A protein has these predicted regions:
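Pepsin/retropepsin-fold aspartyl endopeptidases
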Residues: 1-359
Length: 359
């Protein structure tokens, strides 16, 4: 909850600093002026655009999270739902949540701030990663093998605000010969704070961190600006498709990251079968906005474009599809009809033959 006990749904983002609130969440709940004075700031992020001028709240906001209370000094207002959908109201970063050791339990879906480090016997089944805590961020060392000719070892940024597996920076990918590696080109309208993004999806033979994952789907960035471009202190980022396989303890005092494999089998070896990415924006429109497309995929070939609004799938309005269903996956197969609203308001139906992974 934020000040005055207004409920909010926040994502813990290890790639962020403090509290960030979504612009549409504030507008739809008539909270644009609920938290005091405003100012302006310039902010960049993972997107491929220039840093943007955004509104910020310059008066402190008190955040109640469980039994904890945080005083947030400056709160940026960002277009977060364009990226993550209508069930997210904001982000909470490391400044507040990493004041003490933090337990992140994906098995039972909870975060818990600890009063002190866990005892050695409590960490018996955990693996300690090679980690560093610098500039309010967390990096871990890992090894990635693309194929027999391409492998790398180095620091990867821990990014719990990213829903992907691994994304290599543009600079990292440029050092390798991916000419003979099967690939799929992906472009998004909103690829992170700072605008859209361009990526290439490939398969990697192995990823070694706490244990070894095989045949995983990863991306490398083509962005020339932002957090995935070049001149970064890491070779890529690791997102929740990987981290959700583990229960985690973060200890900022000793700069330690401990992980324990859980029972989640994950979807890291599966690539897109619809060949597009959508964002549920039923808070502001009639459906899901197409945010990204794979070049030459079944969605693009059918005529779907970035910015289209999907209003129904197989004649079922997407407004009826719950968040729980979306998270589990719709398991669409074969001939599938998408009813789409184009930017000019025209309603068009497209038939996609769903089944083949993009890579």
């Amino acid at each position: 909850m934020a000040s005055d006990f207004i409920p909010v749904t926040l994502i813990y983002d290890t790639g962020a600093d403090f509290l960030y609130l979504d612009e549409d969440y504030l507008k739809l709940n008539h909270l644009q002026n609920a938290f005091g004075r405003k100012g302006k700031a310039t902010m960049g992020g993972a997107g491929n655009g220039e840093p943007e001028r955004i509104d910020i709240f310059i008066d402190p906001i008190t955040v109640h999270c469980g039994a904890r209370e945080y005083q947030n000094e400056i709160t940026p207002i960002i277009k977060l739902r364009d990226l993550l959908g209508c069930y997210t109201d904001g982000l909470l970063g490391n400044t507040h949540l990493l004041m003490n050791p933090l337990e992140i339990n994906f098995s039972e879906s909870y975060l818990r701030q600890l009063k002190g480090p866990l005892l050695a016997e409590q960490l018996d089944n955990y693996v300690k990663l090679d980690a560093r805590f610098e500039d309010n961020r967390i990096d871990v060392k890992a090894t990635l093998q693309i194929d027999d000719e391409n492998s790398l070892e180095g620091w990867f940024r821990m990014d719990l605000g990213c829903g992907s597996t691994i994304i290599l920076t543009n600079e990292t990918a440029s050092a390798f010969n991916f000419m003979d590696v099967p690939k799929a080109y992906f472009c998004t309208q909103a690829g992170g704070i700072g605008g859209g993004s361009e990526e290439v999806t490939i398969r990697a033979a192995k990823f070694c961190m706490a244990d070894t994952l095989e045949n995983l789907v990863i991306d490398y960035s083509l962005n020339e600006k932002g957090a995935l471009s070049s001149d970064r202190p890491y070779i890529g980022i690791i997102g929740n498709e990987i981290w959700s396989l583990y229960d985690i303890v973060l200890d900022p005092v000793s700069s330690s990251v401990w992980v324990k494999r859980n029972e989640n089998q994950g979807t890291y070896a599966q690539s897109s079968v619809t060949h597009m990415a959508t964002v549920d924006r039923t808070d502001i429109c009639g459906g899901w906005i197409v945010n990204g497309l794979y070049k030459g995929g079944v969605a693009e070939q059918a005529g779907i474009e970035i910015g289209d609004i999907i209003v129904a799938i197989n004649n079922r309005p997407v407004k009826e599809i719950t968040w729980e269903e979306q998270r589990k996956g719709l398991e669409l197969q074969g001939e599938t009809t998408y009813t789409v609203q184009k930017p000019d308001g025209q309603i068009v139906s497209y038939t996609l033959f769903i089944g083949k992974q993009i890579i």
